[in-house]
Each structure stands twice: as C-alpha cells, then as structure tokens.
Amino acid sequence: MLRAGMILTVQKMSFDFSKRVAVAARLLAVAGLAAVAGACGPAPPAPRAGPLRVLATTTIVADLARQIGGDRVAVECLMAAGIDPHSYKPTPRDADRLATADVVVANGLHLEGRLAELLERLGRRRPVVAVGEALPQDDLLSAGGDRHDPHVWFDPRLWARCGTELADALARIDPPGAEGYAARGRDYAARLTTLDAAVRDRLAGIPEERRVLVTAHAAFRYFGRAYGVEVVGVQGTSTESEAGLADINRLVELVVTRRIPAVFIETSVSDRSVAALREGAAARGHEVSLGGTLLSDSLGGPGSGAETLEAALRANAATIAAALGSSTP
C-alpha cells in the first residue's frame, strides 16, 4: 500500500546501475538532479490549472498513463516507438525532461536499466511511479537471481492491476481527479478482461504440438503463461547482450527436433539472431518460415494501427495464430 504523502517510487533493488554511475552522474549534473541530503521522499506537485505533465518511459507505459489519466494528464513519452528500453541510453535532454515533469511513470523491474540512476535520484524529489513494482512477487516470473521478468503487460490481467495502481497513485497526487482516475481504471480493467478472452479464443485453434513461440528475446513469457504457449527466446529477458553461438545452436536443435514451422521477429529488437536461427535450421534440412513481426517492448508508431496495448495484443495474437496454423478464424 502507498503511504500517505508518498507515491510509489522506483525501488533501488529494481535497477542495476553500478556500471553506469559515471554516465548517469554527468546527466544528473546537467539536469541539476543531485539528491538532496536528508530528503524524505517525493512531494506531490502543487495544484495547477492545467493537466498534470506526465512523462512515461516507454510507449506501453505512456498508453497506460493516457488510459488512466484521461484529460487530467498531458502525457509525453521518453522513448519513441520501436526503441528497445533494455538498451536505451539516456541523454542530457532526457534528464531535462524528467526534471520538469510533474509525474514520471515507468515500468520498473529492470526494464529501463540504463535510466536507473536518473529515476532513483529523481524519485527523491518528485513522484516516480513504477507500475510493475506494485505487483505481488508471486505473480512475477523470475529472470534469474533476484530479478523478475519485466514484460508484465503481456498478461492483460496483470496489466489491469498495474492500471489500478496507477489510478491510486495519480489520485494521491491529484485528489480532485481521484474519482475519474478510479472510474477509468475500472473501465480499462473491464476492457482488458474482454481483450484477454479475445486473445484466448484467437489462439485456441493452434494444435498442441505447434504451441511454441520462438522469438528474438524472451519477452513473451507472461503471454505464454496466460495462454498456454511455450515461449523460447534466442536471447533472455533482456537484450543488453547479444545471443552467442551456443544460444543459436540450442535453438536450432529445438526447432529442427520439434519441427517448429515458424519463428518471429520483433519491432524493437534486431532480427540478426532470428535470421541466424533460420539459416542454421535450413542447414539441417528444416525450412522455418518467418511467422511475422510481433510488437514486444514497444507499441506501433502513429498510423500503424497498433498504437495502444489493446490493438498491439490483438495484432500479435492474429499473427501468431496465422503462422502456427490455428483453425480459429
């Protein structure tokens, strides 16, 4: 639960930034974000005539902020569509934008690893809401060690709970808008429940032996858990390191042995590893088709038809169902 006067802030344990302190410190100096000694937590911004200025880290989080905030917020997004948040490097301009926002909304759970220092320091000065951090650990998948898989938006039921947490946080920052935030949170949760059922129906016709989703990185594990699909990524849950030859060979063996018909690339991740996987399978006599492009760590850009999470998940489900031979239209 959020304490009175305290907004859900990015937890130190959720960011591994020790190797990037020098870069982050320079950015913090540019933005004037040095921590204040003895700071006891962020204070809500003073009442203002216009909407709250919300800066979201990713397109997916920005969509959530718009859905919950409605006309009481003006949302900007730090990362453009198609950007990989795992490897995104903050710039001095990012520090300026973070410093002038009324509220910063992040995913957390290590997704924005290279923004760690900025977000943690900023959280001592103003509200930083990390929606993924509010989920019970029992609902999170492990990413190795003490880390959790950050791609929680791929389970609509979990994302609905993130929406509720954001509504609660915004209500504490902007009490006059509390009723509206709560109402929009309930409406969004209902729509995500409908979406969950639609995705489930769309995937139901995929034969059991073909319910294997092979992608560039392991972003779809929550999706797999929710819909009974085995998920295999050439890379792990983060894209900060390239897939090695051993990773490629392991996946080639799996694809060939199980006669997997299709693999998928992602909009925000290089397709090099998937291309190498297909070449390796072909060398073993098994042709693997390219099933299509999935939206993973970013929504589609303007005019793509996938500018919201709801649209993106529907598009992904249609692409997966078609490539894996679903009998459901």
Named regions from a protein language model:
Residues 1-21:
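Short, intrinsically disordered or compositionally biased N-terminal tails of bacterial proteins
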Residues 11, 15, 39-329:
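Extracytoplasmic metal-acquisition and chelation regions
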Residues 15-16, 23, 30, 270:
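Short amphipathic alpha-helical "recognition" segments used for binding
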